[in-house]
Amino acid sequence: SVGFKAGVKDYRLTYYTPEYETLATDILAAFRVTPQPGVPPEEAGAAVAAESSTGTWTTVWTDGLTSLDRYKGRCYHIEPVAGEENQYIAYVAYPLDLFEEGSVTNMFTSIVGNVFGFKALRALRLEDLRIPPAYSKTFQGPPHGIQVERDKLNKYGRPLLGCTIKPKLGLSAKNYGRAVYECLRGGLDFTKDDENVNSQPFMRWRDRFLFCAEAIYKAQAETGEIKGHYLNATAGTSEEMMKRAACARELGVPIVMHDYLTGGFTANTSLSHYCRDNGLLLHIHRAMHAVIDRQKNHGIHFRVLAKALRMSGGDHIHSGTVVGKLEGERDVTLGFVDLLRDDFIEKDRSRGIYFTQDWVSMPGVLPVASGGIHVWHMPALTEIFGDDSVLQFG
């Protein structure tokens, strides 16, 4: 007789394993699961584990040709969310072998690629990931990190100051360069291309790069300080992006910029490697993040996107401002700011940190407070972010 019955089987028979002891090499995920009415939470959690690892909707004969026990994701714990009806945190452990080394792209394709459209779930949110050292060690991480950046800039013991050039679209390259010069000459450390400044008809990228480089050198000569302008290398193809980064390097400027979510993790990791090889700092903007992280019960929390960026590589990343927001936001924001900067971060549910994260020796990323802040926010910002941050006005 055949060794299995055809037909749809309950996932929880195979993928819900409450007695499982997680391994130090497992990637652990915390999902906020909202099952459809009538679907038990164990089945919903197991469905997530199955569909994001080895499972499919039925048993197939090729299952016998591999070791499911070795390769399957396991839902090992489920807890109800306090104050929410029919919402659960499902903890899933993935064996390390399911993931390609050094690829954030593959990690996300596996963990969040398919499960979010699942019929048994009303909504699903990835709240946190625990990246084991065995996996994080396969990534280069940030091109330089906080300490090396301070050494390159010769600026210590204070937050770095920057601003975004406005109006963000419509200036000619020459006038744009003028604005950069005035800001840097006036005392800022950095100026920034807006995230939507790429290479538009009114200002092509190469013209902007040349005028900004001129502004940087002039301001440096007059102030005796090292200055920078985040030249946005984001482009329509990754080859064009690398070409723009190479041009920035030839001009001798210290830093380039990338929109990592719209540009994609594959392009970002390539650019990050190039930046380390060529001594460029890399500023990361998170355009499109709110599409993914704004809903409370569906999507991916920004702390996961921040962890992914630290692995893919970036020296700065925009991380919200806290100022003027609700107090609760403050703890959660500081939670992922610590995840960006520190080596070792303890589990702390009050700050939204579901797992203890050990980055071992991976360099840190400077959090950038940007968007709607002005000089009156200064005391609050320095108190919240401390010295290792970039405060960007305008």
Curated annotation (Swiss-Prot):
Q: Name one GO molecular function term.
A: monooxygenase activity
Q: Does the keyword Oxidoreductase apply?
A: yes
Q: Which residues carry this modification: N6-carboxylysine?
A: K192
Q: Give the positions the UniProt entry annotates as the active site.
A: K166 (proton acceptor), H285 (proton acceptor)
UniProt cofactor note: Binds 1 Mg(2+) ion per subunit.
Tell me yes or no: is Oxidoreductase among this UniProt entry's keywords. Answer: yes
Q: Which cofactor does it need?
A: Mg(2+)
Q: Which GO terms describe its biological process?
A: photorespiration; reductive pentose-phosphate cycle
- Which reactions are catalysed by this chain? 2 (2R)-3-phosphoglycerate + 2 H(+) = D-ribulose 1,5-bisphosphate + CO2 + H2O; D-ribulose 1,5-bisphosphate + O2 = 2-phosphoglycolate + (2R)-3-phosphoglycerate + 2 H(+)
Pfam families (alphabetical): RuBisCO_large, RuBisCO_large_N
User: In which residues is substrate bound?
Assistant: N114, T164, K168, R286, H318, S370
The annotated site for Transition state stabilizer falls at K325
Keywords on record: Calvin cycle, Carbon dioxide fixation, Chloroplast, Lyase, Magnesium, Metal-binding, Methylation, Monooxygenase, Oxidoreductase, Photorespiration, Photosynthesis, Plastid
Report further notes. Answer: The basic functional RuBisCO is composed of a large chain homodimer in a 'head-to-tail' conformation. In form I RuBisCO this homodimer is arranged in a barrel-like tetramer with the small subunits forming a tetrameric 'cap' on each end of the 'barrel'.
What is this protein's function per UniProt? Answer: RuBisCO catalyzes two reactions: the carboxylation of D-ribulose 1,5-bisphosphate, the primary event in carbon dioxide fixation, as well as the oxidative fragmentation of the pentose substrate in the photorespiration process. Both reactions occur simultaneously and in competition at the same active site.
Q: Which family does it belong to?
A: Belongs to the RuBisCO large chain family. Type I subfamily.
Q: What is this protein called?
A: Ribulose bisphosphate carboxylase large chain
Which source organism does the UniProt entry give? Cabomba caroliniana
Point out the gene that encodes the protein.
rbcL
